[in-house]
Amino acid sequence: MLSARSLFQEIHDDDQAFRLFCSIAAKGEDQGGWENGRIARLVPDPVLAPKVARHGADEDKHGRIFKALMHKRGLTERDVPDDTDYTMILERQGIGLAHARLRRDEPLTEQDVITYLAHSRVTEQRASEQMLMLKRIFGDHPELGRAVRMISNDEDNHLAFCHEELLRLAYHGHGRAILDTLQATARAEIRTYRDVSLAVMAHLGELLRWPRAKSAALAAGIHAVYAYERAGGWRRMTTLKMPARLNALGGPAPHEQFA
């Protein structure tokens, strides 16, 4: 019987599948770390900038954690197939701040900040949900549990930060721009997540020699999730509410104890 638990256990138990999974995750975290680091330097707001820097530091830490998990098994990073590069595929669709913009030493505008926060609000929702699922599966695992719990907590902090900052901007009259940006970002994200999920499963299927029936069942599941999200599930990524964790990224990052 197919389940998320059995699927991720199969990935964990195979060195090459685990290597691909962690390499994809590490690359995404590294890109997020670079982006947030650049944004922190370009944000004119002296209160917001250190929070963005903390966000970037967390993403860099996550990248190191995924690499450390590979190294513990004697594995090295591998090249990530282009069709699994979630971050860059979103950027090519004009979602988030383009890397070319971030490489210019020009202060970000208020609309740039809205674009950044809306992009983060949507993608951190996805990351928070994914890490919660992994925490349920591997939270007590002797090898993975500590890492999964740490990353999951960080992703929840990032999501809380996005809610709080977007609500602050909405209070100052940017509500319509925020809503429009969130909706456009969410619609693009659900398509990208579907396509990247199909690509990742195809690459894993080759490594794990899945029979056609299993690959077809997994693909059908991915398409079913997309159908639900397209029908209205995407709206969960666009709502804003004051988080229980206020000032979640205030202060320096906690001392890193894993990688």
Language-model features and meaning:
Residues M1-A259:
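Non-heme di-metal
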